[in-house]
Amino acid sequence: PDGQTLAYCAFRSVATGADIYTISVNGGEERRLTTAEGLDDGPEYSPDGKHIWFNSVRTGLMQVWRMNADGSEQTQMTFDETRNAWFPHVSPDGKQVIYITYHVGDLEPGQHLANYNVELWLMPAAGGQPKRVAELFGGQGTINTNSWAPDSRHVAFISYRLNEKK
């Protein structure tokens, strides 16, 4: 958000899995922010630059997490035992987060999904009870690309249906 630092996910070893890193846009040394076993993925800065939202499988299911931009205070934000939660996107006003879920058992928690029924959920950025806003068909490369309108009142997303051969 400051135009100077990038947050990204990288797989550096089989032992540690994928973690979240930051690096200056001018290059230099990357900084590893997460060290949990398994997949930490989908980092996104909050509009004020104070937090990075991401998804992690560190509790056994993929859930939404938030940390300070320096990697401290990694806090689980979703606690759904029946769904895996992915790809949090913070509203421009910083008040809401939208993310996707898919049901436990559809895939392994760390697998990227495609061609599944998924749900779009909305929750307060400060934490609290999420609410389901849509059930869609999609997955990786589609509704994980949801985007907030500048006024934080609407969300655009992609959904699709597979053509069936007749």
Predicted features by range, described:
Residues P1-K166:
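Sequence signature of WD/YWTD-type beta-propeller architectures
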